Amino acid sequence: MNIDDRKAALLARVRDYGGPLNELPVLAQFLAQVMHESGGLRYVREIWGPTKAQKGYKGRADLGNTKPGDGSRYRGRDVIQVTRRANYRALTKWTRETFGTKADFEALPELLSDPGWLGIGAIWYFLAARKDLIKYCREGNIEMVTRRVNGGLNGYQDRLRWYDDCALKLLGFGTVRDFQKSAGLVVDGISGPKTRAALHVALSHVRETPKIEHKPPVMSKAAPVSDISDKAPKRPAQRASDPKAPTPAKQPGWGAIP
């Protein structure tokens, strides 16, 4: 699955199951974190050494890793990596309650590496594991978004760069200078606090979301088959007013993001 296919698959997942992540101010923040965490969608599975840190996952009851091999078995997967048995269990519970799927990520953790599920772990993280993330995204508070995703500010400058790229593409601008000129800002080509604040405001005012530039990929059948369904979830059958039913939105386009 190439990078363009991953972009299309991720956006399709957000469109269908992301609910508030489809709001452009939120989407720009979400994509910035995803692109940094996954190295521009190049890495969707933790490389296992094991390193010294990875060896520390062994026998950690606080992580839910209570059985031999749990550290490797529940290694990081998806565009924002889900790790630990406890989190795979929580993801399973959320997808079942929200979408009615029978997939069991705790029993079959490798399902999270299948293209048919790409992005669902990151969506769960923003909507369920760290519920305050949506509030910070809507406020345009990229520092707090980063702290909640990372636990600190590691790679902060790269996350800012990705935010600039994603926000510009979602708004249809090619460069920072183009946006600054349109927004009546000082045109210096530097994206600082004022430019990012203006990007956030501009995203908040967009009423229609631009269309995706890539066709959705054919989903992989590589995931193991068992009596537990390993298929990607169907759209929720609940009423649109039900808080458990994410509201689908038009698909945005960010194919030009490097």
Where are these regions (language model features)?
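Secretory-pathway/luminal and periplasmic proteins that interact with or process carbohydrate-rich
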Residues: H36-E46, G151-R159, V186, S204-P210
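Extracellular low-complexity, Gly/Ser/Thr-rich intrinsically disordered linkers
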Residues: E110-Y156
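Short acidic, glycine/serine/threonine-rich helix-capping segments at coil-helix boundaries
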Residues: L171-V218
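Long, low-complexity, intrinsically disordered segments
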Residues: D227-P258
